[in-house]
């Protein structure tokens, strides 16, 4: 009805071939085939988008339009991706802001894949001792784990969890190394949107939900609820200070170009203006006056570099993720384990298929929670991504029973420090529950791929003085467990959930995909990738199909909650899937359709060069092709 239509994957997947005639000569479906047909009986809400020159899938229609304009005016995928980052930081402030993070993966036409961290570091004053001994803030914290009457944890909001902003440096480095346009050209759409743009339902609602917190910070209230009134959907929303900040950065570039500097050196001048100039000083002064830890010296010492991504090969497909400072390797570990199973024979989204994916993820998450951290500070076991280690882990999976334990691996004399053995959980006010992420994925005909997971500085955020820049809260992803790899330390990156993904097939571009969803991200992306790679779903079907979510992990932020063996299933799945997984020992819970928390976007390059784009309709994701 309308644009809705039944998913047309049955013939392509070969899942409903009729069996041989029985007694009366009629061709009948086997029980397995009937069950598979019922699993596939769900509706595709949006059509797949296809393009010949380029395709993009991003967080909102406005960001997607900005991206397409840059591509159609001659910019490459990185130019377009940086423009999308900046525009998203303005318009998607419920999920992501200028002071936040943006890990990037980029494939260049020469076939090389590059990683840019896009996450800031802890200030010099952000120490374990500080958080173990500080007093609770009664306005931001309901209750806390007590250690000698102290809180013992990092707060989720305010200025204390603020890191050095990482997104700006990531955008500038990507543009400088892999783009073709000047900063001013890719920043102009963001500056115009900051001057004013129509606010959508999601952003209006996020301001309403955060109103009690915003009143604690006059700088935030002045931006998000001027005159004490939240903007309603369709109102023109202004961020005058942020527009002025962006335009001041553009002026720094123009001055450098006027002085005869190259494009690359002029972008470096923008970087210096932000991290060593008046913007850094104003943010640092504001944070200090509020009792926070971020200082000008932390900005001046910060610099990102292009890094080598992590990688595994799954049935001839090269899958790339960012380093162990993200949770990205969870996907790689799960793929290594699943490579030992015949997933086609199990059948897409059958109970046994879901069971094997969930059990593989449980093992990978146990390793994440015990071992992953900033490799510049800790030695992460290299064996985690080996095929032999995956084989050893696969042997732990019982095909007939769900595991209820956290089982991180052990490496020689090194023993894991798993957070499940420590008291971390604490309640939070609803208004302060973590608010999610956005995503940007681009593919172009020249072989470039761009994948980003922008996040941080989400609502309710603290606006730093007159800069218009919201501060990130990402410091709360550190742990306060002495001896844990992800323990808070000055200059360190927290182990974050943000996880862009690139896939090639024998070196040729295949997919770029990412999603919001915090700890759901790797789970959602695993399901999207396998749907596209193993079962040949198109990009839209892959991101929109019913998904599960395991909560058998340690939450990466907020209350660091643990819900062993809890498995959420999309209500679009047939009842027998719920029943069979319950019989296997999973603690199954129902999740409303199209309300999963994750909302993947993806682009997929076909063998003939046509590029597909898909966007989960949850949370306003939008795709376009050209």
Model-derived features: where do they sit?
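Short, small/polar residue-rich loop motifs at catalytic or cofactor-binding pockets
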Residues: 306, 434-437, 496-498
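Noncatalytic scaffold domains of N-terminal-nucleophile
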Residues: 24-65, 69, 77-269, 274-326
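Bacterial N-terminal signal peptides that target proteins for export
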Residues: 1-10
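Extended C-terminal regions of large enzymes
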Residues: 321-324, 329, 503-520
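Internal maturation/activation junctions in enzymes
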Residues: 34, 280, 284, 292, ...
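Extended C-terminal subregions enriched in glycine
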Residues: 446, 492, 525, 534-595
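Bacterial N-terminal signal peptides
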Residues: 10-18
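Active-site rim segments in enzyme catalytic domains, especially the processed small/beta chain
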Residues: 90-94, 103-123, 131-142, 285, ...
């Amino acid at each position: 009805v309308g644009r809705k239509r039944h998913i047309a994957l049955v013939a392509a997947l070969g899942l409903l071939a009729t069996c041989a005639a029985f007694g009366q000569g009629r061709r009948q479906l086997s029980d397995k085939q009937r069950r598979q047909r019922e699993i596939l009986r769900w509706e595709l809400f949006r059509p797949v988008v296809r393009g010949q020159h380029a395709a993009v899938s991003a967080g909102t229609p406005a960001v997607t339009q900005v991206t397409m304009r840059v591509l159609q005016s001659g910019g490459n995928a990185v130019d377009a991706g940086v423009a999308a980052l900046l525009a998203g930081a303005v318009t998607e402030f419920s999920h992501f802001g200028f002071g936040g993070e943006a890990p990037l993966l980029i494939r260049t036409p020469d076939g090389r894949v590059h990683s840019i961290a896009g996450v800031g570091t802890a200030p010099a004053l952000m120490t374990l001792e500080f958080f173990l001994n500080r007093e609770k803030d009664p306005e931001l914290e309901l209750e806390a784990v007590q250690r000698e009457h102290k809180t013992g944890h990092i707060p989720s909001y305010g200025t204390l969890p603020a890191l050095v902003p990482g997104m700006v440096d990531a955008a500038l480095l990507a543009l400088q190394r892999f783009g073709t346009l000047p900063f001013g050209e890719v920043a102009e759409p963001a500056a115009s949107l900051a001057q004013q743009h129509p606010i959508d339902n999601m952003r209006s609602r996020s301001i309403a939900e955060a109103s009690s917190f915003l009143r604690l910070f006059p700088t935030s209230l002045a931006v998000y609820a001027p005159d004490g009134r939240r903007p309603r959907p369709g109102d023109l929303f202004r961020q005058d200070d942020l527009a002025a900040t962006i335009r001041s950065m553009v002026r720094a570039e123009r001055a450098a170009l006027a002085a005869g500097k190259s494009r690359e050196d002029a972008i470096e001048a923008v970087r210096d203006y932000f991290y060593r100039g008046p913007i850094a000083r104003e943010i640092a002064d504001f944070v200090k006056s509020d009792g926070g830890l971020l200082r000008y010296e932390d900005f001046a010492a910060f610099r990102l570099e292009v890094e080598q991504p992590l990688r595994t090969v799954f049935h001839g497909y090269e899958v790339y993720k960012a380093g162990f400072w993200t949770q990205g390797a969870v996907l790689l570990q799960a793929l290594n384990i699943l490579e030992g199973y015949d997933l086609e024979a199990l059948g897409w989204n059958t109970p046994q298929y879901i069971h094997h994916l969930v059990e593989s993820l449980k093992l990978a998450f146990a390793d994440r929670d015990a071992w992953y951290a900033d490799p510049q500070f800790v030695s992460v076991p290299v064996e985690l991504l080996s095929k032999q280690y995956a084989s050893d882990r696969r042997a732990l999976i019982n095909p007939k029973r769900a595991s209820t334990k956290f089982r991180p691996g052990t490496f020689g004399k090194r023993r894991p420090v798993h957070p499940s053995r420590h008291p971390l959980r604490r309640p939070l006010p609803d208004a302060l529950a973590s608010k999610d992420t956005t995503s940007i994925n681009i593919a172009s005909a020249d072989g470039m791929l761009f994948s980003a997971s922008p996040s941080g500085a989400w609502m309710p955020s603290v606006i730093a003085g007159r800069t218009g820049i919201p501060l990130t809260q990402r410091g709360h992803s550190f742990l306060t467990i002495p001896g844990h790899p992800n323990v808070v330390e000055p200059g360190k990156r927290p182990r974050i959930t943000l996880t862009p993904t690139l896939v090639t097939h024998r070196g040729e571009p295949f997919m770029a995909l990412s999603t919001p969803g915090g700890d759901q991200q790797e789970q959602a992306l695993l399901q999207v990738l396998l749907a596209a790679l193993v079962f040949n779903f198109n990009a839209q079907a892959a991101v929109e199909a019913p998904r599960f979510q395991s909560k058998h992990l340690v939450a990466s932020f907020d209350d660091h909650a643990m819900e062993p063996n809890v498995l959420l299933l999309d209500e679009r799945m047939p009842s027998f899937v719920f029943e069979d997984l319950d019989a296997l020992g999973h603690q199954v819970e129902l999740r409303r359709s199209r309300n999963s928390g994750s909302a993947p976007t993806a682009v997929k390059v076909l063998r003939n060069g046509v590029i597909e784009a898909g966007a989960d309709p949850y949370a306003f994701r939008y795709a376009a092709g050209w």
